[in-house]
Amino acid sequence: MQACCGGNSMASLQQPGRVQGSVFPPIMPPVTKFSQQLKFNISKPFRSSFLKRNLVSEMRASSVSLPNVEISSKEIPFEDYGLGEVDPEVRTIITKEKDRQFRSLELIASENFTSRAVMEAVGSCLTNKYSEGLPGKRYYGGNEYIDQLETLCQNRALAAFRLDSTKWGVNVQPLSGSPANFAVYTAILSPHDRIMGLDLPHGGHLSHGFMTAKRRVSGTSIYFESMPYRLDESTGIVDYDMLEKTATLFRPKLIIAGASAYSRDFDYPRMRKIADSVGAFLMMDMAHISGLVAASVVADPFEYCDIVTTTTHKSLRGPRGGMIFFRKDPINGVDLESAVNNAVFPGLQGGPHNHTIGGLAVCLKHAQSPEFKAYQKRVVSNCRALANRLVELGFKLVSGGSDNHLVLVDLRPMGMDGARVEKILDMASITLNKNSVPGDKSALVPGGIRIGSPAMTTRGLSEKDFVVVADFIKEGVEITMEAKKAAPGSKLQDFNKFVTSPEFPLKERVKSLKERVETFTSRFPIPGV
């Protein structure tokens, strides 16, 4: 199976044999065509049959004895062709995206490359089954194997984070991180209860209650009363003293640790003390760092938190899903197990995505391996190498460095913003994102960029390679600064129009950078595709 593109059948799941075109050579020369990874096998159409052949592919008939019934072609409800025959337009788009991923220097901190095994599970027949409810308590029949799968996934989730199953439970059905967070709010809060999360411009996440002076942006801030805590702008570290003072006055029912652009560990003992002082629940959203937590290369939130949520596709390298871990003992008079499970279903969701749960089970098995721990150590060491080189090159980093998988670069001292840098780097096949930094006034034209190491570490980059990455970024920023000076207008739209016009005077420099980036990146394989 070519999992990313679905070019072949589920053959790799159902019969032995190696799929051609799905494995990279160790080292590849500079490419002009994505020949190795874009080689699709167009097999014959899969003609479904109810009795003599498998519905997924033309496999041998089952060994189970069946009546000798002839079925005419008129009785076959469909012909199961591959994607290339059925929808070449979608196939072409997927091919282009696959090419982009291969050529690009992928530095978005929330992205990663999952494994072929996860891809196979996600692309399996598990997607066909409805299973509202929990294992053993379904609203549909035919779920005996789905029950086995979800129970296995739950057990692996607890094992991956070294949790005692008598003290902790987990729900693996959330569709992603934000739905998981909102399920927690639904479970333990009433409408208009008070919450505190890290402010978005200071590294927090939308789902933690972000709002502006004019608008309640997040659904969390619409249904609950939100008060952010912030960083100490002089250090780039969470201002725990101010958090404690604000919590004492605001009296939140829930305090949320976790972030989307914070490069340091949280002080969980301090946050536990603050939460206890006001009678609040303490929740950790470890979406970005769950893989690092599983590998014990960052601080462990489970010792101090009542609830821990996460996505599954970032540093954990799984499918796009979510999980909610909860203590089994009642907290503040609430049975968290019952409350969380009921909030997920029937409160907010219907049937879970069983194909995702299958992929998650696969990734959680890998998360317990020595190889996974070694990988996470490289994620951190690569990020530190990147951070150190950026500092050498004159960049200002929020908090001065990194303890985890990302760095947040403040471009304002250079008279630059993240939106323009993101644009030029994207033109040069360097993919990262503009990001707010403490003190920013605009989320559309923020003053920073966020850079992450997980995806390119997955592809095999070393600390020395991330030094090269930093040099590429520096060159891109220098081009951006010159382009900003030459642009005819001061607005971002003027800049974007200018740099994409045929008359852009720096296009050859961008082209040169792009060619060198793609030559560099093309040496490293992508797993899973």
UniProtKB/Swiss-Prot annotation:
Presence of keyword Chloroplast: yes
Keywords on record: Chloroplast, One-carbon metabolism, Plastid, Pyridoxal phosphate, Transferase, Transit peptide
Location in the cell: Plastid, Chloroplast
Inhibition and activation profile: Inhibited by 5-CH3-H4PteGlu1/5 and 5-HCO-H4PteGlu1/5 in vitro.
One record GO biological process: glycine biosynthetic process from serine
EC number: 2.1.2.1
Pfam families: SHMT (PF00464)
GO molecular function: glycine hydroxymethyltransferase activity; pyridoxal phosphate binding
Self-association and partners: Homotetramer.
Protein name: Serine hydroxymethyltransferase 3, chloroplastic
